[in-house]
């Protein structure tokens, strides 16, 4: 079974209730597990801290969400792939190939990992990333 690659903008909807959370929950339950990168761990921790500082969530909610995330990693619900030099160079190539798409650095890295894992689906809440994935022949599913 080909597993979808899930970026942080979509995965956050699993741990923090926000627009698109219910749709993402339905999507993710269609698969035995989903693919993320090690980068997602850093981005999710940052996202939770940013929302805590903004007053959108409490410290307890932020810590609880990250603990749930770590539990999902430990149980194998999230298949974590490392980010290596080959992915960095892949992102560089993607940015050259996808010049019409205003991809951000980390989104290019996410797409490079998605390509390396041969995911045929990318889940994201980022419309720019979704369009870039589609340009690569990867089906994008957007949330939010």
Q: How should these model regions be labeled?
A:
Residues 80-83, 140-144:
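Short acidic-hydrophobic, aromatic-tinged amphipathic segments that line or gate anion-handling sites
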Residues 19-22, 102, 142-143:
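Hydrophobic/basic alpha-helical segments enriched in Actinobacteria
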Residues 1-42, 47, 51-64, 136-138:
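Short, well-structured N-terminal submotif of metal-dependent ribonuclease cores
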Residues 20-22, 67, 108-111:
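A generic local structural motif
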Residues 127, 136-141:
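C-terminal binding/interaction regions
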Residues 45-94, 135:
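Active-site-proximal, substrate-binding regions of enzyme catalytic domains
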Residues 75-131:
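Active-site neighborhoods of divalent-metal-dependent phosphate/nucleic-acid chemistry enzymes
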């Amino acid at each position: 079974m080909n597993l979808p690659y899930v970026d942080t903008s979509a995965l956050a909807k699993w741990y923090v209730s926000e627009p698109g959370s219910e749709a993402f929950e339905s999507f993710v339950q269609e698969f035995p597990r989903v693919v993320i990168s090690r980068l997602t761990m850093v981005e999710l921790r940052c996202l939770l801290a940013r929302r805590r500082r903004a007053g959108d969530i409490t410290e307890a909610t932020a810590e609880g969400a990250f603990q749930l995330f770590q539990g999902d990693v430990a149980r194998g619900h999230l298949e974590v792939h490392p980010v290596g030099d080959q992915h960095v160079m892949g992102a560089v190539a993607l940015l050259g190939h996808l010049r019409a798409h205003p991809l951000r650095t980390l989104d290019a890295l996410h797409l490079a990992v998605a390509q390396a894992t041969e995911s045929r689906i990318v889940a994201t809440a980022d419309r720019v990333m979704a369009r870039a994935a589609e340009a690569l022949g990867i089906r994008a599913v957007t949330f939010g």
